[in-house]
Structures are given as structure tokens and as C-alpha cells.
Amino acid sequence: MISTVSLFWALCVVCIVNMARYFSSLRALLVVLRGCDPLLYQYVDGGGFFTTHGQPNKQVRLVWYIYAQRYRDHHDEEFIRRCERVRRQFLLTSALCGLVVVSLIALMIWH
């Protein structure tokens, strides 16, 4: 029988791997964005997005831009595909993180 603690740690590893995939896809999206829409790139602070001096309010703008699917009217097909991918990975990673939190609470209650 598989230990519940082992299952929890496996779920944590899967969540971390998906977070890494999400950030990698987001970085690739910013590269495409810099080439196809420099104004939007500046609007979401593309140059300082992954730095310590990045502006969180501008970073949240990109997240909401993708979450609300406002990219669908964009002229560049590559950008639209990247946004779709980032959106799917964001939803998957959010669900996995929620599952990790619920699993941690359940693990604390039962052990």
C-alpha cells in the first residue's frame, strides 16, 4: 500500500514541475510579445517581469489580460497560441496548488 505522505510529496513535486513549466512558458510569451507588440510589452513591464525590481501591479495586468482572454483579438497568431498555453498552464497549476493545500490540511487532520 502506498503511504499517504509519499502521495502528498509526489503531488508537491508534480505541482513544482508544473510551476516551472508555467514560468518557462510565461518567459517565452514575453519574448514573443516583445517582437509582436512592444507597447503591450512595456505596459506589462516585460523587461523587468522576472527581476526583483519588477512592478507587481504591471505583472498582475498580464495575468488578468490572459485570464480574461483579451488576447483573442490580437493580430499575431503565435502570441495567441502562447497565451492559450500560458492560460491552460496557469489554471492547471492553480488547481494543483489548491489540491496540495487541501491535501496538506487533510494530512494534518488524519495524522
Swiss-Prot record:
Q: Where in the cell is it found?
A: Cell inner membrane
* TM regions (residue ranges): 1-21, 90-110
Which stretches face the Cytoplasmic side?
Answer: 22-89
Q: Which UniProt keywords apply?
A: Cell inner membrane, Cell membrane, Membrane, Transmembrane, Transmembrane helix
Q: Name one Pfam family in it.
A: UspB
Q: Which domain of life is it from?
A: Bacteria
Q: Which GO terms describe its cellular component?
A: plasma membrane
The membrane topology of this protein is:
Multi-pass membrane protein
Q: Which residues lie on this side of the membrane: Periplasmic?
A: 111
Q: List the disulfide bonds.
A: none
Quick check: keyword Zinc-finger in the entry? no
Give the UniProt family note.
Belongs to the universal stress protein B family.
- Which protein, by its recorded name, is this? Universal stress protein B
Q: Which organism is it from?
A: Salmonella typhimurium (strain LT2 / SGSC1412 / ATCC 700720)
Q: What is the lineage of its organism?
A: Bacteria, Pseudomonadati, Pseudomonadota, Gammaproteobacteria, Enterobacterales
